[in-house]
């Protein structure tokens, strides 16, 4: 196709000006300055560029995204002019690294954020210029601290910049290590997790940082300035060792690997020791109970007063009641003790047998203190959402989810459990589908923080739910007759109102008395247990084995007595025979102070 001469020069001039405005100071090719002429008739632009480089005995790498068709005649005095012309016509960007010519589409130009720790942006720029990689046509923007550089350009240019930055960082680090010695220490963890833990639930996720991440944040956020005795600043070359600090987690060993100056290693040891502490094991059981509203009196519930428990305590579920009435009647708010919980569950079981109550769900979850745990039982159905031109499936999820973070609060000998609770309970309402067939989802969300004493349970109640059930009855055959069959059909609707209760039962899982007895005489019980045929209280072999293991020195036996006393249990000691000496066996039971080696349980209310 022929173009008018003035139109052709106008297009070339416009493209050249645009190229110079966007990419000034272009690096020239070091190829032979000989003319290049090419006549294309619907040929591939890729083939044209390959033929162009072959004409100068050069190597070219053409992007796969360049698939245009070319028609026309190209005549240029040198390769630089041809390359700029073809780039302006077909939106190309090129980069020459001294050996290979790389050609990409403008859409492939990307950006990178390079983080420098050992060197600065000015040093990186100087290294790029000396190596011949620097290209002023592309973006280069450092931050005020000269530690972050925002670079843009074609992919090959970005790769060379990143490789140069990595080599410069390593070289600078080696130079710094010569001026200041570094040490590497491995700190194994016993209880805490070295690496991060990710908790997934529904469409969300929560990251629980490990010890390595916590230390990295402390190092990255802290600004350390060292001064001498005469209040003079230390030169930066002497403080470079603090910038080389590196903390990594080794999941296979559950250990922390630290690289830093030797004088700072005790600080890491103290921090890691403070973070690596044993956590209490806490079990939380959640009971979701539906009770017929008409049968609340059978349960002993009065929303104006509370629940009558087995030890004559009142449990006020609706905590917005009269506080003076609560105080005068000894009410415990939404907390009940173990005896009151047994009474409540017994009444629920009775009503369940009569069809007036239902235990909807009862999940149990075991976790550690200050560690978030999630139990999620849900269902997902998908709804087709149609737009103007596209349609997609959108998932709707509902079910029972318990998310909690427990914490143990200790005051003297008393322990409480602080629960950060999130309960979500959802279900599909029956007979609630609309015209489009999408059912209605009912959700109940409870988000609270509660403190529960040892042996107590938390009740959250007063949530009413209305259920509508539709039943259709008819006379066989006659009810199916058109029009006339309506006389032989009957449709009945039944509305049932229920009250939903959430019962949360937290408890601390301790190691038990058997653990203390095993530690008392320092003997391992596991080998003997494996030889016992029957594990029961009636097993003679097991009783003989336990009797031998319970015989221990006096100081160890007294430690067990002290532990029993802290748990409100009385005990006394009896003599027994150990391997080479006399020992003492702890007997749990009531005793009088006049008896030998008697430790009575402390009286309630007496500290």
From Swiss-Prot:
InterPro entries in UniProt: Bact_Secretion_Sys_Channel, NolW-like, NolW-like_sf, T2SS/T3SS_dom, T2SS_GspD_CS, T3S_SPI-1_N0, T3SS_OM_pore_YscC
User: Where's it mainly located?
Assistant: membrane
Keyword Signal carried by entry: yes
Q: Where in the cell is it found?
A: Cell outer membrane
Entry keyword set = Cell outer membrane, Membrane, Plasmid, Protein transport, Signal, Translocation, Transport, Virulence
Q: What are the BP-aspect GO terms?
A: protein secretion; protein secretion by the type III secretion system
Q: Where is the signal peptide?
A: 1-26
Quote a single Gene Ontology cellular component term.
type III protein secretion system complex
| Transport keyword on record | yes
Q: What induces it?
A: Thermally induced and down-regulated in the presence of calcium.
Q: Which Pfam families match?
A: Secretin, Secretin_N, T3S_SPI-1_N0
Q: Which HAMAP family match?
A: Type_III_secretin
What family does this chain come from, according to its entry? Belongs to the bacterial secretin family. T3SS SctC subfamily.
Quaternary structure (record): The core secretion machinery of the T3SS is composed of approximately 20 different proteins, including cytoplasmic components, a base, an export apparatus and a needle. This subunit is part of the base, which anchors the injectisome in the bacterial cell envelope. Forms a stable homooligomeric complex. Interacts with the inner membrane ring inner protein YscD/SctD.
Q: Which NCBIfam families match?
A: type_III_yscC
Function of this protein? Component of the type III secretion system (T3SS), also called injectisome, which is used to inject bacterial effector proteins into eukaryotic host cells. Forms a ring-shaped multimeric structure with an apparent central pore in the outer membrane.
Q: What is the protein's name according to its record? A: Type 3 secretion system secretin
């Amino acid at each position: 196709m022929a173009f008018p001469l003035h139109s052709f020069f106008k297009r070339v001039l416009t493209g050249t000006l645009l190229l110079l405005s966007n990419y000034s100071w272009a690096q020239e090719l070091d190829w032979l300055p000989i003319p290049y002429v090419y006549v294309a008739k619907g040929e591939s632009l890729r083939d044209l560029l390959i033929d162009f480089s072959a004409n100068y005995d050069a190597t070219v790498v053409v992007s796969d995204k360049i698939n245009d068709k070319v028609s026309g005649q190209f005549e240029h005095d040198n390769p630089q002019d041809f390359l700029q012309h073809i780039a302006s016509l077909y939106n190309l960007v090129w980069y020459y690294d001294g050996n290979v010519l790389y050609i990409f589409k403008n859409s492939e130009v990307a950006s990178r954020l390079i983080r420098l720790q050992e060197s600065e942006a000015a040093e990186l720029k100087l290294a790029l210029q000396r190596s011949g990689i620097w290209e002023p046509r592309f973006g280069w923007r450092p931050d005020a601290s000269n530690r972050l550089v925002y670079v843009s350009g074609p992919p090959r240019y970005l790769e060379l910049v990143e490789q140069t930055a990595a080599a410069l960082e390593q070289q600078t680090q080696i130079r710094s290590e010569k001026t200041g010695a570094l040490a590497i220490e491995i700190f194994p963890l016993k209880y805490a997790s070295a690496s991060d833990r990710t908790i997934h639930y529904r469409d969300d996720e929560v990251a629980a940082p490990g010890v390595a991440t916590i230390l990295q944040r402390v190092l990255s956020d802290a600004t350390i300035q060292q001064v001498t005795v005469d209040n003079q600043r230390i030169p930066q070359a002497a403080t470079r060792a603090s910038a080389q600090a590196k903390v990594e987690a080794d999941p296979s060993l559950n250990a922390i690997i630290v690289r830093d100056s030797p004088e700072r290693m005790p600080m890491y040891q103290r921090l890691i020791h403070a973070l690596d502490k044993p956590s209490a094991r806490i079990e939380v059981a959640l009971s979701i109970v539906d009770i017929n509203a008409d049968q609340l009196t059978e349960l002993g519930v009065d929303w104006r007063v509370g629940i009558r428990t087995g030890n004559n305590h009142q449990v006020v579920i609706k905590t917005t009641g009269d506080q003076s009435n609560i105080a005068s009647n000894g009410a415990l708010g939404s907390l009940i003790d173990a005896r009151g919980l047994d009474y409540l569950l017994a009444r629920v079981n009775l009503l369940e047998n009569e069809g007036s109550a239902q235990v909807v769900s009862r999940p149990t979850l075991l976790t550690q203190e200050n560690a978030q745990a999630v139990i999620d039982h849900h269902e997902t159905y998908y709804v087709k959402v149609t737009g103007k031109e596209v349609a997609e499936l959108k998932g709707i999820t509902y079910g029972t989810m318990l998310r909690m973070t427990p914490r143990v609060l200790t005051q003297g000998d008393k322990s409480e459990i602080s629960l950060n609770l999130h309960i979500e309970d959802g279900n599909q309402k029956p007979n609630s589908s609309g015209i489009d067939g999408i059912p209605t989802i009912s959700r109940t969300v409870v988000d609270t923080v509660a403190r529960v004493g040892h042996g107590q349970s938390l009740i959250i109640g007063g949530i009413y739910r209305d259920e509508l059930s539709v039943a259709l009855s008819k006379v066989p055959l006659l009810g199916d007759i058109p029009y006339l069959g309506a006389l032989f059909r009957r449709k009945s609707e039944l509305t049932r109102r229920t009250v939903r209760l959430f019962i949360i039962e937290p408890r601390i899982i301790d190691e038990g008395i058997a653990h203390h007895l095993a530690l008392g005489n320092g003997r391992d019980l596991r080998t003997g247990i494996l030889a016992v045929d029957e594990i029961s209280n009636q097993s003679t072999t097991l009783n003989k084995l336990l009797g031998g293991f319970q015989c221990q020195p006096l100081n160890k036996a007294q430690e067990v007595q002290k532990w029993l006393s802290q748990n409100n249990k009385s005990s006394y000691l009896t003599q027994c025979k150990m391997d080479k000496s006399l020992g003492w066996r702890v007997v749990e039971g009531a005793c009088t102070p006049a008896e030998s080696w008697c430790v009575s349980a402390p009286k309630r209310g007496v500290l």
